[in-house]
């Protein structure tokens, strides 16, 4: 019998009570409360053994008729997660776990799909705790989120994998479950796609207090198209305002689930964990086993180890692989010899062999990160020579939606930044970069990202993991323009924009935006999207109008500015959005040049709509006047289109009172001192340099967005 501290949320529905009654022989310890609202008494069934629906309702009505202010509670303060399934071995018997007998029918590969903060990492922690894959004293919040940045932000940035062992109670057999914890933020959707490629099934986790979010729907559709079996789970049912019934209604209408398929859980309290693992065994099919074919595997992730070189995470499709086997990475035709293979538990542990259907890692003593690409196929060398190997389906190339320049704070760190980006791309294949040069920041790279959060995380990883500080220019999107000579080019920054008069037609990217919001926020969010030049497409209602899905077409440049922050603010944190697809529409663009004392500051120039050029130019020079420190000479700030200045301001010179000691006497003496000072300032203005602080880039971007 399983013991749980369990609180079913305020306003629990009849449907929720019926679903709770289906969980077999579960003893619930009570939690005291003074609330007496209908349905709330399902939260506490102190020491009742619940085996059927009739007994459940009898217990609830008994509690409801209790007139005392505080219900009596007996609680030993413990939470037992051992459940009906058991771990196959205690920690310390690592060799038995790693090199266990192989049985493809008792293998399951699955990932967790959920929006940010819906509880997927906490659920993964409960899996590890229940199956004793990790010692209880080692378990900490977000255990699989091993990056310091992930713990600080409370989000998953990198996919993580772990092999866990679970004894299925109905047949007593031990099953190998390969769990992959995936990111939920839209900017890291590429990580979720790679997880899906390595699995046959997925647990779809939805926060019962917030409902289904837009990004969850998008990722789930990708999983369905890939043929994955989904297991729906409503999480956080211990929270008093969990709306279980509405969440179930949304799941059934969006994905055609039956109510019986949907599981309820509280990852925080450990309720429903056994039922989820049982469903993984029962519903997700085992991988296809092809042991008789030559070895072939898909590289779905990788990282760089200073001692081993490139460590590739693979899903083995065919055959077996072991140490000292000769392989070929088909993408770059790289021949190499395997130095080690193993599994993630979740730490990397070596084993003797990897077989068809398994998820693991391999090292080939490759030191060049650029030679091993995520999505590549690795195959046995002998089979490649016999032309007996076809590449597995690779991932679609990354298409960045946001571009920004990264320049080292110290000009001598250019090569260090180059090496750091190469190693980072090994772990995050969606980053694209190419060398660039700025008249202000010097040599650096123009980089492409999936969004502003992706950009921010990359900058912080460069600082923390590689100790390389960078200057970030204002983010932009890829524009297209047709020149008067008929040539079409793509431009992502002002530095590469053609000269004024050469462009015949310019175009900006638009995208399809899906916004999911509470029903009472409809007017505010619609007005926001209209201000962003958005075009309404469709509105859908869920849960009787409590939840709305709005579809708009919006310029990409508007999405990457402050839309996310504004949406969260207007919806009290409950709004979410997703965007996909790109189309180009005509717009009259121009390059807004920034001149400082007559010289162009290329790093601060930007592309703007010609209709807004005068407003943007004025705002730009006003912002620069606030962030550029004054000198002993006058600094002229100008915004120009081509050779025409459209806005101008100046920063007055610092003035020293050279006549301070001339208290009286001939006024010609004072005039002479002032003339000499003026000559000196003129000379300094001719030879002096104006230093632009690093914060100027951020200040300008914030002001114009």
UniProtKB/Swiss-Prot annotation:
CDD domains: EF4_II, EF4_III, LepA
Subcellular location per the Swiss-Prot or TrEMBL entry: Mitochondrion inner membrane
Membrane topology: Peripheral membrane protein
Chain intervals with Polar residues compositional bias: 76-90
Chief location of this protein within or outside the cell: mitochondrion
Function: Promotes mitochondrial protein synthesis. May act as a fidelity factor of the translation reaction, by catalyzing a one-codon backward translocation of tRNAs on improperly translocated ribosomes. Binds to mitochondrial ribosomes in a GTP-dependent manner.
Protein name: Translation factor GUF1 homolog, mitochondrial
């Amino acid at each position: 019998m399983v013991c749980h501290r369990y609180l079913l949320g305020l306003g629990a529905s009849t449907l929720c009570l019926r679903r709770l009654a289906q969980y077999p022989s579960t003893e619930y310890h009570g939690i005291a409360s003074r609330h007496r609202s209908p349905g709330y008494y399902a939260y506490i069934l102190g020491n009742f053994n619940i085996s059927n629906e009739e007994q459940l309702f009898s217990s609830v009505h008994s509690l409801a008729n209790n007139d005392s202010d505080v219900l009596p509670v007996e609680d030993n303060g413990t939470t037992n997660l051992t459940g009906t399934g058991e771990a196959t071995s205690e920690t310390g018997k690592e060799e038995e776990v790693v090199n266990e007998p192989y049985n493809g029918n008792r293998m399951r590969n699955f990932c967790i799909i959920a929006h940010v903060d819906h509880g997927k990492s906490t659920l993964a922690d409960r899996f590890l705790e229940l199956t004793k894959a990790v010692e209880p004293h080692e378990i900490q919040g977000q255990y699989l989120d091993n990056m310091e940045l992930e713990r600080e932000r409370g989000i998953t940035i990198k996919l993580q994998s772990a092999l866990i062992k679970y004894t299925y109670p109905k047949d007593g057999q031990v099953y190998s479950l390969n769990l992959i914890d995936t990111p939920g933020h839209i900017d890291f959707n590429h990580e979720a796609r790679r997880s899906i490629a390595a699995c046959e099934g997925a647990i779809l986790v939805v926060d019962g207090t917030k409902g289904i979010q837009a990004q969850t729907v998008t990722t789930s559709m990708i999983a369905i198209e890939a043929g994955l079996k989904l297991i729906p789970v409503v999480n956080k049912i211990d929270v008093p305002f969990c709306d279980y019934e509405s969440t179930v209604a949304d799941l059934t209408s969006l994905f055609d689930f039956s109510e019986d398929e949907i599981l309820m859980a509280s990852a925080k309290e450990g309720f429903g964990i056994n039922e989820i693992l049982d469903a993984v065994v029962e519903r997700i099919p085992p991988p296809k086993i092809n042991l008789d074919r030559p070895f072939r595997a898909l590289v779905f992730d990788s990282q760089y180890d200073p001692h081993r070189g490139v460590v590739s995470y693979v899903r083995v499709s065919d055959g077996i692989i072991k140490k000292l086997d000769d392989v070929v990475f088909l993408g770059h035709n790289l021949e190499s010899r395997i130095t080690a293979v193993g599994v993630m538990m979740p730490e990397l542990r070596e084993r003797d062999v990897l077989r068809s259907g398994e998820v693991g890692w391999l090292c080939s003593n490759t030191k060049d990160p650029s030679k091993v690409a995520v999505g590549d196929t690795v195959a046995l060398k002998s089979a490649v020579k016999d032309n007996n190997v076809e590449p597995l389906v690779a991932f679609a190339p990354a298409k960045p939606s946001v571009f920004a320049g990264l320049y080292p704070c110290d000009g001598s760190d250019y090569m260090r930044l180059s090496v750091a980006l190469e190693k980072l791309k090994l772990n995050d294949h969606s980053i694209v970069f190419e060398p660039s040069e700025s008249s202000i920041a010097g040599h650096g790279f123009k980089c492409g990202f999936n969004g502003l959060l992706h950009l921010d995380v990359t900058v912080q990883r460069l600082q923390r993991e590689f100790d390389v500080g960078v200057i970030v220019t204002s983010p932009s999107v890829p524009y297209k323009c047709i020149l008067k000579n008929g040539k079409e080019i793509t431009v992502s920054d002002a530095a590469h924009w053609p000269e004024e008069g050469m462009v015949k037609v310019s175009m900006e990217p638009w995208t399809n935006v899906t916004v999911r919001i509470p029903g009472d926020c409809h007017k505010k969010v619609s007005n926001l999207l209209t201000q962003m030049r958005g075009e309404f497409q469709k509105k859908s209602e869920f849960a009787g109008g409590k939840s709305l899905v709005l579809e708009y077409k919006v310029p990409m440049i508007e999405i990457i500015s402050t839309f996310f922050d504004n949406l969260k603010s207007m919806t009290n944190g409950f709004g979410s959005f997703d965007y996909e697809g790109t189309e180009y529409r005509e717009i009259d663009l121009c390059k807004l040049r920034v001149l400082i004392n007559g010289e162009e500051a290329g790093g601060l120039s930007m592309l703007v709509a010609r209709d807004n050029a005068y407003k943007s130019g004025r705002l730009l020079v006003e912002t620069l006047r606030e962030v550029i420190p004054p000198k002993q000479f006058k600094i002229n700030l100008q915004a120009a289109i081509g050779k025409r200045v459209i806005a101008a301001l100046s920063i007055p010179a610092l003035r020293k009172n050279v006549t301070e000691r001339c208290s009286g006497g001939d006024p010609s003496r004072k005039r002479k001192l002032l003339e000499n000072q003026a000559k000196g300032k003129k000379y300094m203005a001719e030879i002096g340099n104006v230093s632009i602080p690093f914060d100027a880039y951020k200040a300008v971007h914030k002001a114009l967005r």
